[in-house]
Structure formats: structure tokens, C-alpha cells
């Protein structure tokens, strides 16, 4: 089967996200502000509940380190973003009265609020002259598809460290950031914007450095052996082109679009040696394998009623490919050793709507969200059977999953349009108050949910450093 001719070079934006820079550049003069201006406010107004022997909700406001660590529920502040910092929202927007006034304590004055918000918007610079969570850290990225932002979660503190606001880069709230891919060293990350028809490239400091055009982009997958990336079409697109995109992530230039001869090609992945790409249809029980060297491709039928294969993933050893059927609750194991032929070797039943499986580095476990069951499933890849099903507070229409680099924590995004999860605090924002999206943090040593982060509207794609 023949490929399309190469496309024109992508447009690369000259914009940068300076408001989210994580380095301490030009921050030396601000290093003393916390001690002189910020800590005295917390000591006077907050210490009775958040210092010493009493730290309500686990929040210690006796030091910069304690503030940055956050509470049992997540971050207290987001550097460069006072408006979305819980501490500021509690003090200005809380339904029933500003905190701590509603608890019978003196509220912050306008001058004190201005001092705190200006400091946060300036980077929340600490005594060392740096913004919190600066440098090369292990981050998980979670898109807020309903509001045009991306959460940057630090895996050591398990808090939202930054929020990337795409509206500040010329996109609107309806750009629909969807899926994320991250380089193995964390140096760059990529996000698809469904409505904007773009794939964006950011540095780890969240500086926008590249862009490529692609109609209704959905899922991204990096070639483990080169700088290539493939991109499928969004699930939201009813009748997109029957092609997937192949581009270079160094240059951010589209190399070509590959014909896949199937409607709604959403799921995409690579063979581990980078020789083949695979795609599956949402509308039909069919997937395709494409040999990138020869251009030859083969279509493969999957038996049964329409499954709606949401995503494809290949194990680290390259021998098995998996996919979940949204409509049937089936989980498929394909034999990927041949690459051209991918026969089904086993099918099992799992909880409803298995989405976005990921693997640990050893390839012995697969983790996936069950969107219509409000659960997470762990599959033993050696036995190809369900090992554990996790449920609990915060799991509400789970969508994507990612692992911390040390594989201690599993992060699962939850869209919560079914209102299974209730907001901790009401801020007078009907969307947030009714449908707060979450990221559940699961400790894989115990398989227990240890933290529920409230992150924004319609959290979707969840990406961390790859496990290959």
C-alpha cells in the first residue's frame, strides 16, 4: 500500500512560556522576600492551625519548605499562578466566607493578599533564589481538556507544581489539549490540541519551542529508536482523514501522512525496534501494521461485535501488543513478534471501558483505567490475567495513566462528568463545584489511593517518561 508524499514543514511558534520558567533566573533579588514579607503574614494569621504541633490537613505554613510541600490533599500554591493556587482561592473565593475568617480567625487584609499573590505570580521564590520544583525533576503532565491548560505534577511531592495556560500562548480555552508524550530524560514534552489542529513541543521548563500542524490530533507515540513520532486522530472527530501522521520531534516537521484505509484511526503505537507502526479503528474491528522501510501494510480483522479499540501499546520486549475494547470490556493480547502479522493470542474480560494501558519497565504489569466503571485494573502480563482492581475516592470516569520514574506511584486522570467525586471546597464556580476533575495518586506498594489532586476541567491525557 502506498504512502502519501511528504507534507510541508510545520509552523514553529516564536512564543515562549516565560511565566512558567522554573529556573531561578533574575530571582536573586527576590530571595529575601519570603522571609521579610510572606512568612510574617503566615505566622500572624495562619500559625494557630498550620504550624508547630497543629498542622490541619497536613499543611505546615511555618516555612517555605512546608508551604511548597503542600497538604494531604495537594499543593497549597502553584508558582506563577496565584489565581489557581488553593491558598489564594480559599482566602478570596470560598463559598460561605473567606478562610480563615469562616473558622473564626482574622481574615487576610487586602494588602496581605496583594503581597502574597504578587509573590506567587512572581514565581514564589524561596530563600535559595529559585522557584519551587526548579531543575531536572520527574514530572507527570495531565491535560485539562475542558479549559485549555496542562497540569505539571511533581512526583516527589505529589502536588501540581505548575499549570501551563495555553490561552497565554495565543490559543483559546476550547483548544482541547488531549494527549501527552514525554522524552525519556524529561527534556521535552509534547501535547496534542484537538480543536487547534496542533502538536506542541515544550521544554521541561514549559517553554514552547515547536509546533506541527495536524488535523484533529489525538494520541501520540514516540519511536523508541529515533526522533520520530506518530499521531492518530481524535476520538472526537466523526469522519477524520484515514491517515496517521509521522513527524520528526527534533525539527517538529511533518514527514508524511500514512494511509491506514480505515475510519477513525485513533489508537497508534510502534514496534519496539521502530520498524513498524500500528493503528486501530474506533469504528471497525480492524487494525493495520505498516512496514516503514518498504511501505507495505497489512490489515487485520478482530472478531466479535464492535469493540472500539481505544489505544494500542507494545510491551518493552516487543513481543506483545495490547488494547482495550471500550464497548465490550474485552482486553486483547496480540502476538507482535512477527510485526507484520499480529494475531490475537488471548482475550480476557475486564471492568467496563478499558482505556490507555501502560506498562512498567519490566513489562510484567499493565495498568489501565476503566472509564465507565470508576476503577483501575492491574494486569499480570506473565499470566495475562487480571491481578488487582482498585477503586475508591477520586476515581470518577478515569481516563489516562502514567507512572513515576521510580514506579512507586501511578497517576490516573479522572474527568468526573458523572459527579461521583465531590469538590472539597466550593468556590462559586459552577463547573468546578459540580465537576472537579482529579488525578488520583496510587501507591503501588499497597495499591491504595494516597492522594486526590483537584486539577481542572476534563483532565484527559496523562504522560510521564516512557518505560522503555
Predicted regions and their residues:
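Positively charged n-region of N-terminal signal peptides that target proteins for export
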Residues: 1-4
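Aromatic- and Gly/Pro-enriched helix-to-coil junctions and flexible linker segments
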Residues: 20-139
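Intrinsic disorder/low-complexity segments
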Residues: 6-10, 26, 268
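Short, solvent-exposed coil/turn linker segments
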Residues: 16, 33-34, 63, 78, ...
Amino acid at each position: 500500500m502506498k504512502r502519501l508524499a511528504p507534507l510541508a514543514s510545520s509552523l514553529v511558534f516564536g512564543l515562549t512560556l516565560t511565566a512558567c520558567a522554573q529556573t531561578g533566573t533574575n530571582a536573586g533579588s527576590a530571595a529575601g522576600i519570603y522571609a521579610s514579607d510572606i512568612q510574617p503574614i503566615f505566622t500572624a494569621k495562619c500559625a494557630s492551625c498550620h504550624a508547630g504541633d497543629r498542622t490541619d490537613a497536613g499543611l505546615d505554613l511555618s516555612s517555605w519548605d512546608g508551604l511548597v510541600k503542600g497538604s494531604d490533599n495537594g499543593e497549597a500554591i502553584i508558582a506563577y499562578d496565584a489565581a489557581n493556587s488553593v491558598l489564594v482561592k480559599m482566602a478570596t473565593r470560598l463559598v460561605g466566607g473567606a478562610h480563615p475568617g469562616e473558622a473564626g480567625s482574622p481574615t487576610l487584609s487586602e494588602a496581605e493578599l496583594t503581597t502574597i499573590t504578587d509573590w506567587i505570580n512572581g514565581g514564589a521564590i524561596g530563600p535559595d533564589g529559585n522557584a519551587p520544583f526548579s531543575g531536572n525533576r520527574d514530572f507527570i503532565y495531565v491535560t485539562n481538556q475542558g479549559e485549555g491548560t496542562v497540569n505539571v505534577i511533581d512526583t516527589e511531592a505529589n502536588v501540581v507544581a505548575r499549570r501551563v495556560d495555553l490561552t497565554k500562548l495565543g490559543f483559546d480555552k476550547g483548544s482541547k489539549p488531549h494527549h501527552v508524550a514525554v522524552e525519556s530524560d524529561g527534556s521535552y514534552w509534547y501535547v496534542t490540541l484537538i480543536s487547534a489542529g496542533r502538536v506542541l513541543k515544550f521544554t521541561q521548563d514549559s517553554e514552547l519551542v515547536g509546533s506541527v500542524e495536524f488535523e484533529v490530533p489525538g494520541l501520540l507515540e514516540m519511536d523508541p529508536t529515533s526522533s520520530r513520532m506518530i499521531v492518530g486522530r481524535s476520538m472526537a472527530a466523526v469522519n477524520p482523514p484515514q491517515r496517521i501522521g509521522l513527524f520528526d520531534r527534533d525539527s517538529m516537521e511533518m514527514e508524511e501522512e500514512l494511509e491506514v484505509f480505515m475510519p477513525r484511526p485513533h489508537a497508534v503505537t510502534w514496534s519496539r525496534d521502530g520498524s513498524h507502526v500500528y493503528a486501530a479503528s474506533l469504528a471497525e474491528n480492524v487494525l493495520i501494521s505498516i512496514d516503514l522501510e518498504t511501505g507495505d501494510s497489512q490489515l487485520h480483522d478482530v472478531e466479535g461485535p464492535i469493540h472500539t479499540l481505544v489505544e494500542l501499546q507494545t510491551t518493552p520486549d516487543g513481543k506483545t501488543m495490547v488494547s482495550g475494547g471500550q464497548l465490550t470490556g474485552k482486553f486483547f493480547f496480540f502476538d507482535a513478534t512477527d510485526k507484520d502479522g499480529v494475531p490475537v493470542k488471548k482475550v480476557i474480560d475486564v471492568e467496563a471501558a478499558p482505556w490507555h494501558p501502560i506498562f512498567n519497565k519490566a513489562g510484567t504489569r499493565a495498568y489501565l483505567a476503566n472509564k465507565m466503571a470508576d476503577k483501575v485494573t492491574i494486569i499480570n502480563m506473565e499470566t495475562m490475567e487480571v491481578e488487582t482492581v482498585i477503586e475508591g475516592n477520586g476515581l470518577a470516569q478515569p481516563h489516562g495513566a502514567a507512572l513515576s520514574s521510580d514506579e512507586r506511584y501511578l497517576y490516573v486522570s479522572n474527568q468526573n462528568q458523572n459527579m461521583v467525586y465531590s469538590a472539597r471546597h466550593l468556590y462559586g464556580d459552577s463547573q468546578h463545584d459540580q465537576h472537579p476533575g482529579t488525578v488520583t495518586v496510587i501507591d503501588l506498594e499497597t495499591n491504595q489511593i494516597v492522594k486526590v489532586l483537584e486539577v481542572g476541567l476534563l483532565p484527559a491525557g496523562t504522560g510521564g517518561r516512557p518505560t522503555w
